[in-house]
């Protein structure tokens, strides 16, 4: 009987977050499908649980937050950390990375996720202003709060711009470091993409009962 050897399909995944991890996990569960999967992430670590970032402030390690590492131990998967796709050539079906690697693909998956946008106001790049998205972000925030509070000899005050899930997580993290936290939200309620007015109002009262100030329908500026 003649054996048929199928050419492995080349799959490139741009992004190494939770969605990319789940996608690759699903792919490699199909043991009968020949494939090579290349995952390109711009952080110098494997995918981790961003929703659990606040745990870092209470003693969780990067390893505690890491998603199932066995996904990237599969022989069909190549993980490229600390790199970034700079160019996609759809005609040649290749991607070019910051490290000047050209990687061919049969299927290209963009799983870059969201990004933490800095507020477009003067002073947003000054020391003490942070975004809250990566382990490096929260590590820098923790070090700054510790050093600054020692220097001043008192607890700090902090503002969180954005009342979504990560913003509220950030406010909780600040409070856990004895920072007087205020959440500033542009819309009329917290988590406006998930909650109606009643739910947003209830959440606001719960946070205020915990000592976190909330300002809705507010704009941001620095001085």
Where are these regions (language model features)?
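Redox-cofactor binding/interface segments in oxidoreductases and associated redox assembly factors
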Residues: 97, 110-111
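Rossmann-like dinucleotide-binding cores of NAD(P)H-dependent redox enzymes
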Residues: 155-159, 166-218
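A structured beta-alpha segment of the ubiquitous adenosine-cofactor-binding alpha/beta core
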Residues: 85, 97-101
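Conserved small/polar residues in nucleotide/adenosyl-binding loops
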Residues: 221-223
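A conserved beta-strand/loop element that lines the FAD pocket in flavoprotein oxidoreductases
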Residues: 76-84, 89, 211-218
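Beta1-alpha1 glycine-rich phosphate/pyrophosphate-binding loop at the start
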Residues: 2-78, 171-194, 198
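Glycine-rich dinucleotide-binding loop and its adjacent helix/turn
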Residues: 112-177
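Core beta-strand elements of the Rossmann-like FAD/NAD(P) dinucleotide-binding domain
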Residues: 101-107
